[in-house]
Structures are given as C-alpha cells and as structure tokens.
Amino acid sequence: MSHFELQPGQLQLSELRDWFYQHQTLKLSDEAKDNIATSAKTVADVLEQGRVVYGINTGFGLLANTRIPPERLTDLQRRIVLSHAAGTGDLMEDSVVRLMLLLKINSLSRGFSGVRQVLVDALIKLLNAEVYPCIPEKGSVGASGDLAPLAHMVLPLVGEGTVRHNGKVLNAEEGLKIAGIEPFELAPKEGLALLNGTQASTALALAGLFRIERNFHAAIVVGATSVEAAMGSRAPFDERVHAVRGQPGQIKAAEMLRHVLTDSSEIAKDHENCEKVQDPYSLRCQPQVMGAVLDQIEHASGILVREANGVTDNPLVFSEEQDIISGGNFHAEPVAMAADILAIAASEIGALSERRSALLIDSHLSKLPAFLVNDGGVNSGFMLAQVTAAALASENKTLAHPASVDSLPTSANQEDHVSMATFAARRLTDIAKNVSDIIAIEWLEAAQGLDFRRPLKGAAAVETAFNCLREQVAYYAEDRFFAPDIKAASDLIQNGELAAVVKLPHILSEV
C-alpha cells in the first residue's frame, strides 16, 4: 500500500490519477497542521469577540439574517448536514468518493476554513480505512457548492447515513467503528465548511478525465490499426504537414500515430506503390481531430487541477487580518465549463472511431470482405456491431450538449445563477463508457481486417495490440454471440491493459 503525505494545495495531476485508480494511506504535512490550527483559532477568537459572521452564528442562504444564539451553534451545524443530505439516484463509485474525501481534506488543509484538526483527522481516518460514505449522484446544481453530495459525505461523521466498506453497505455506526471514530459533534463553522465546496463536481470531472485519457490512448492505437487494416497511407502523418500548421495537439497526435505506425509494417510495404491517392477523412485527418481533442483535454485538466487545489469554502477565514469574508468560490462554473469541454472532446473521439468502423465493413472503401466475414449472406459479420457503434456515437452527441449554459434559480432566488457542474461532470462517465465501446467495436473490426491481410504483418505496436485483443477475443470465423466480444475489448481499454502494452509519447502534459 502506498503512503502519501499531503502538502496543502500542491496536488499534481498524476497524483490525483493515482488516487482515483488505487487506495493509498494519507497523512498531513506539518504545514497543513499549522494552517488548520491557525484558522480554527481565528474562528474561536471571532466568537469570543461576539462578532456576527455568516454561517458561524447566523442561518444559511436566505436565512442569513437570522442570528443564532450561542447555545444553539453546534446544533446549527448538525442540522445543516441533516437537512442538506437530500440527494437521489445511484450511489457514486468508491473511486469518486475517495477523490472527494481527498479534495475536501486538501481544501481544509489550506487553512482558510476554520475547522479543527480533529475534524480533518476524522476524514483522514475514513479515507485510510476505505470506509466510503454512500453518496447519491444527483441533487447538486453546482452552487452554493455541491451541498447535497457533500452533506451525504459528512453524514456518517455525525452518526447518520450509510457507508460502503469492501463493497458492503453498512450503517454509520458500523463504519465509524471500522475507521476508529466516535460520532462527531461539529463545532461552529464546521458543518458549513464541509458542505460548501466543489469537491463532488471536481471529483466526478476528474473521474471522467481519467477515463477519457484511456479512450484517447486507445483511439490512437486502434485508429492506427485501422490504417493498417484498410491499407491506408502514412503520408498524412508526416511531421512536416503538422509543423506548418503549428497546432500543438495536432503535432503531438501525429507523432503518436507515427510512433505506432513504424517502418516495420509489411502491410505498408506491400501497398506503398498503389494507385490510391487519398484516404477518407476518418483515416487521413486523425491528427487534426485527435490533436484538437488533446488540446481541449489538456486545457480542461489544467482547470480541474487548479480547482482540486483551490479553496471553495464560504465564508473564508483570513487569519493574518482576522477577517472572515463571504464570497462565491463555491460557484462551480470553472468545473462545469471544463466538463463541457471534455464532453465535446470525448464525443469527437467516438464520432471519428465510429466512422472508421463504418469504413472497415464497407468492402468498396476497405477492399476487405463485406462486413468483415467470409460466406457473407449466411453470415452477417460485423453488420450490427457497427450499428451499435452508430447508436452510441449518436447518444453521445446528445450527452455532449453543454450543461453550463443552463441555470435555474434556487433557494428562493438567493442563489439565482448556478453552474450545473455536477451533472456536467457526472455524464462524462456515461460518455466515456460509450466511447470505450465504440473504440472496442472498431478494434474488433480492425483486428479482423488484419487477419484478412495475413500473412502480411502490421507495424510492431499494431501487432502488440492485436495480440492483446486476440488473447481475449478469437478470430470471427462465423456468426456468434457478439456482445461478449465487445465487452471484452472494451474492458481492455477501460482497465488500462491496452495502455500498458502499447506506450505512447506525451498523452498528457502534467499540469
């Protein structure tokens, strides 16, 4: 098991990726502990001075002008957790909840939230024990933070709700016992500090990003395999073509394709003097499309890393000046727009792959047997698999519609503009899974095409990917139950096995 010392506000993209894919044990740096102690003392001092501060000794939202007496301040914090835990829908995956806990701990450790060390320690104990609060996916509009999901995250600390441990759902009491925690009484400001923030939408967006990274990698490798299967030209990937345009993502994507399509290909040598002048766009324009996708992935990843390290609480505690200021950092518009960018980019990965799958089954374009099967007519081959790819690509076009352009006033018009970031981020998983299946179908077709080109071999990396697939899915000699083949190929993409056997240069620049 890996051990991780948190330096507040310094999480890297690679570290966030590691946390998403695997459990680690977390401890705080000395800087984080100092930050927390200083901030908590400021809140205590403000209360001692009798100052009126939103969320500490007032109501919330439209009830902000209601003064809460000292004897009810802890009750206030508990009640906000209970009342705001109003989510619905399926539960978030453990990997997403793990990221949420990490991001909340990171934010509190910056020292602008006014919570006590004992509270942060309790969150760390949940995380380290892999006791994950059960959090419904739906119920947040992405301002004032992800209130409902974060309330569900906090419920177990106050002895309510349920948790999941080793795949089993337990009540809060059982979960706290495993983590070594007693039910918690929240101090002034702590309930609000836990609920305010963009950690749910950011965690969901990061989860989508990491899945889309694997889709991007697979689309490059499988797209190159389709070039081999269709006996396409390598000339469009020439370094000079992309240098004169100057788009960085395009230059990188072309380099990746050249990396896969090396000079080792017998197929390429066999048709290098053929009469065909140009390939269809889905083969020829891969660097242009995938490069644009890569630029957007890198742009969105930068926004999400900054958000993961940011403080999105309200109000914020500035200890040096003894100020507590109400602002709007909880508004998740940056996350919503980043998620929208990723949705469009991922949808385009699938759209291009679907067009290549259509090309491969068309004997007039690919010069392969119709629907990639012998004895056509008796056998339907890949006919309906390609229809599935078309259905998924079309579904993604709807899912990719921007969520951030929508807003609906809430909380009696106090919160009159919201980001819809949580939905924007949540649908990325659906899009990414669709894209994995689309690429899987293309991969099955391209591998079948390579089999028809035998005894000629493709480039070394193409053959490595081919062998990876053939270990799970046999050559399609005649019609058989097709769905398990698609799932097997998609699993190789989603679980990272394809990425492990075929490495590519600079998939993502670290930010």
From Swiss-Prot:
Keyword terms: Cytoplasm, Histidine metabolism, Lyase
Gene3D superfamilies with a match to the protein in the record: Fumarase/aspartase (Central domain), Fumarase/aspartase (N-terminal domain)
PROSITE patterns found in the cross-reference section: PAL_HISTIDASE (PS00488)
UniProt catalytic activity: L-histidine = trans-urocanate + NH4(+)
Listed EC numbers: 4.3.1.3
SUPFAM superfamilies reported in the protein's UniProt record: L-aspartase-like
An example Gene Ontology CC term for this record: cytoplasm
GO biological process: L-histidine catabolic process to glutamate and formamide; L-histidine catabolic process to glutamate and formate
A Pfam family it matches: Lyase_aromatic
PTM (free text): Contains an active site 4-methylidene-imidazol-5-one (MIO), which is formed autocatalytically by cyclization and dehydration of residues Ala-Ser-Gly.
Signal peptide: none
Cross-link (5-imidazolinone (Ala-Gly)): 143-145
Modified residues (2,3-didehydroalanine (Ser)): 144
Pathway: Amino-acid degradation; L-histidine degradation into L-glutamate; N-formimidoyl-L-glutamate from L-histidine: step 1/3
Subcellular locations according to the entry: Cytoplasm
Molecular-function annotations in GO: histidine ammonia-lyase activity
Entries under HAMAP family matching the protein: His_ammonia_lyase (MF_00229)
Similarity-based family: Belongs to the PAL/histidase family.
Family matches, as PANTHER family: HISTIDINE AMMONIA-LYASE (PTHR10362)
Name the UniProt record assigns to this protein: Histidine ammonia-lyase
Annotated organism of origin: Idiomarina loihiensis (strain ATCC BAA-735 / DSM 15497 / L2-TR)
